[in-house]
Amino acid sequence: FYSKLDKFHRPRQIFKHVLGTSVNDDMLIFSEKDETFTCGISLTSDEKFFIISTSDHITTEDYFFPSDTKDIKPILFKERKKDVRYSIDSWKGYFYVHTNENARDYKILRCKTDSINSLEVFIPSKKETVVGSLDFLDDYMIRGEKADAIPKLLIRNIKTNEEEEIKISSEPI
């Protein structure tokens, strides 16, 4: 997969290329219509889905499709809403959503990958704490947080919901 740039040199289209074929045969799988938005494509942590992310400076929208499909039809995860940012990842049958919707300093939602309209709060927003990005390893979700300018790492067992904090520093950054 690759993105093509528009006349303003911004990525606005996603194409699929099959090795050994001409680029003239490449298939357009996504085209961003809003000139203020750009797009890109990535693979989820469990490599089960491709995510097409489109965004401007304050708003995002994601589409997904299974990584093992030949019939590519990107599915809208959640319609864009002005000033709402979100990103999705998948791990062990769930989509995890890092978003600022109704959460100035972000929160993490999740839903089963086959039930995207059934989002539940997994990590709530926290007063005066920025809930940062997340990564996955085996049965664990690793995320960063920052409170009073002091960063910390949290490791959560996604089966038991037990969580452990790893202190990085007691000094503000």
Language-model segments: residues:
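Peripheral, non-catalytic segments that deliver or gate enzyme domains
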Residues: F1-I173
